[in-house]
A protein has these predicted regions:
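Parallel beta-helix/beta-solenoid repeats that form elongated, surface-exposed shafts/blades used
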Residues: 1-203
Length: 203
């Protein structure tokens, strides 16, 4: 127990080997914090005030590498390679969201609030490109070239429909409700030209 160079008080605890195991005190910026250490002298946790004057909690692995972080409205987790794997928090627009990342730090999933304040889910492929999207009354899938391949959702007039596209994003199939609120099936060739259509049971 004592007073540091900056005038702040502190308390240190030691294990049976005489190694420091905990520190409670005041930092250089005037904020308070607690640090704990393992029997190898590696820091295992930090609870206190960060450089931005907000509160934070850091959890470290046995080697002293950050594994999780909570602070300023969000939580982050890291793998053994130091790559972020999870982000849970609040976006700049005030909406909450969750992001997950693969072992190399590339985003794999987004679940949360979109720019239009509606809920959405995005699934990314191993190249970081959107593979599928669910939100605002529709579902979309994309191929590895970023081209839209499937759409299931609501039309502007309230009817539901399914569209499929080829790898060049040219429409090949339409199955759904037309403007007359009747069922419609339309098949197109690879150039998007219709070659078979069924409007109702009489045609």
């Amino acid at each position: 127990m004592g007073t540091g160079k900056d005038g702040g008080g502190y308390l240190r605890a030691y294990n049976g080997e005489g190694d420091e195991s905990a520190y409670v005190g005041t930092g250089r910026m005037g904020g308070g914090y607690i640090r704990t250490y393992n029997n190898s002298g590696r820091e295992t946790s930090y609870l206190g005030t960060g450089s931005d004057n907000s509160g934070q909690l850091r959890i470290y692995d046995k080697l002293g590498e950050t594994r999780s972080y909570i602070g300023d409205g969000y939580l982050q987790a890291y793998n053994q390679f130091g790559e972020r794997t999870i982000f849970l928090g609040t976006g700049t627009n005030g909406g909450g969201y969750l992001r997950t990342y693969n072992f190399s730090g590339q985003e794999s999933i987004y679940v949360g609030t979109g720019a239009d304040s509606s809920g959405q889910i995005r699934i990314y492929d191993n190249s970081g490109e959107t593979g599928s999207f669910l939100g605002s009354g529709y579902f979309r899938t994309y191929n590895r070239f970023g081209k839209l391949t499937t759409f299931i959702g609501n039309a502007s007039d309230g009817g539901g429909y399914l569209r499929t596209n080829n790898k060049f994003e040219t429409e090949t199939v339409f199955l759904g409700t037309n403007n007359a609120n009747e069922g419609l099936i339309n098949l197109n060739d690879k150039f998007g030209q219709s070659f078979w259509i069924r409007l109702n049971k009489k045609n």
